[in-house]
Amino acid sequence: MNADSIRQMIETGLPGARAEVRGDDGVHFEATVVCDAFAGKLPLARHRMVYATLGGKMGGEINALQLRTLTEQEAAA
């Protein structure tokens, strides 16, 4: 698994999302995801939305994913 594959999965699974994913070892990644669908949702709900885009890859091909989830307005602040 690589960072670009994860970015594509997130952006495909969350229409309108922009994702920046980093990770050099192939199993530990950091991602910043900006999506207006996060508006009004608590951080845990936002993270679950992102995890849902990754299917069964979490805990397998992706060992760890540190998330920062923002709306467009939060990202602009």
Predicted regions and their residues:
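C-terminal structural segments of small proteins and small subunits
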Residues: 44-77
